[in-house]
């Protein structure tokens, strides 16, 4: 994504490195990394479930799918959603997840709901949640944080997530040295406001976890 590339450019600038952008055949990424023809994988690369295969930077984006409920709903776990009416945005990652029967999919959970209602946008869905027409919302964590922040108290995100998806920079397993340099640079770029500026430019401020 543009965010990844501009952040990579900013790190290279700090180090006096030349950024070489290399399109990857996804199947040969490990070969390229291990042979040294690339130094890292930096493009919306999900670290969860891959921790044993790469040395990862600090995660910089959280794209997990979560459940939002009214604070006083009495809903605390995913199991509590049985028989409830759950809202989700049409054509969203959360909806895909709730329909998926593949490993990591949550169709079994969705089958316990009383109803799964699709909405064109989250503003409408939150209005329905507020009115009590919905018991819960399935939504990505960035949007959830933004909506809750802008609407004030009265909502909570369940501790149990539908899935966990954090993006990090993947280095060859054991290449801690390069990873440490990049982590230190990410910290500098966070402190000087570069990360926040880029996050705003690409409209992902609520997903970026570098603070």
Residue ranges and their predicted role:
Residues 1-44, 201:
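Extracytoplasmic small-molecule ligand-binding "clamshell" domains
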Residues 8-17, 94-118, 148-152:
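Ligand-binding cleft/hinge of the Venus flytrap
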Residues 16-18, 34-43, 84-87, 121, ...:
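Alpha-to-beta junction loops
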Residues 20-31, 73, 112-127, 165:
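Short helix-initiation/N-cap motifs at beta->coil->alpha
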Residues 28, 44-53, 97-100, 128-164:
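A ligand-binding cleft/hinge motif common to bilobed small-molecule-binding domains
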Residues 62-69, 94-97, 141, 145, 149-202, ...:
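Periplasmic-binding protein-like
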Residues 69-86:
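Flexible hinge/capping segments at coil-to-helix
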